[in-house]
């Protein structure tokens, strides 16, 4: 994860170079400290910035596709409105979004569960010499397979047969080596 101060430096540098920056904060709700990582506080001061957020990941409603963006660049907003589908948000999505964001009990419990499980999983993976776990900031963990001769596909194939779904990261650019990624689930599912 990138801190707000580092994001500010990036946005400032891009502004000097006339570069528009879009930051995807789809997974920010899973972070331990949203204020330390979110670029939303920068939006009023930088017209070369747009922050994108979604609620479907955190609220486990992937089919809903409910998201929003924030920018202080009025010209960019007008261009978006010009090309926006007039029915981009249906009444069910709007209603669900309101309910989701008002459910503070769910938000609190989910954040606590993710925090606890994220720490537990990371600490457990640290004890396995054939794996290198990267400290997670969201609801998933990136793991490098250090066991020579074992590929990410081998691990994926083995786990899918056990009805465990992980992501084979072999198609991810910039990941040199064998990597997998998996989501943090319930304590019972994570223990499996």
Identify the function of each model-found stretch.
Residues 5, 12, 161-162, 171-192:
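PLP-dependent enzyme catalytic core of the Aspartate aminotransferase-like
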Residues 114-115, 128-162:
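Conserved PLP-binding catalytic core of the aspartate aminotransferase-like
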Residues 48-134:
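PLP-dependent aminotransferase class I/II
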């Amino acid at each position: 994860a990138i801190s707000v101060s580092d994001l500010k430096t990036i946005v400032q540098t891009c502004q000097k170079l006339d570069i528009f920056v879009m930051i995807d904060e789809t997974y920010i709700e899973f972070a331990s400290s949203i204020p330390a990582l979110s670029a939303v506080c920068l939006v009023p001061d930088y017209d070369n910035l747009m922050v994108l957020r979604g609620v479907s990941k955190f609220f486990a409603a992937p089919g809903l596709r409910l998201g929003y963006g924030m920018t202080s660049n009025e010209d960019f907003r007008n261009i978006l409105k010009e090309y926006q589908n007039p029915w981009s948000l249906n009444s069910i999505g709007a209603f669900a979004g309101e309910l989701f964001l008002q459910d503070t009990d769910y938000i609190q419990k989910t954040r606590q569960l993710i925090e606890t499980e994220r720490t537990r999983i990371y600490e457990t993976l640290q004890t396995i010499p054939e794996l290198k776990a990267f400290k997670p900031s969201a609801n998933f963990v990136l793991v490098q397979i250090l066991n020579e001769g074992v590929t990410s596909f081998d691990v994926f194939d083995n786990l899918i047969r056990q009805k465990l779904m992980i992501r084979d990261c072999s198609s991810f650019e910039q990941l040199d080596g064998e990597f997998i990624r998996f989501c943090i689930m319930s304590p019972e599912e994570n223990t499996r």
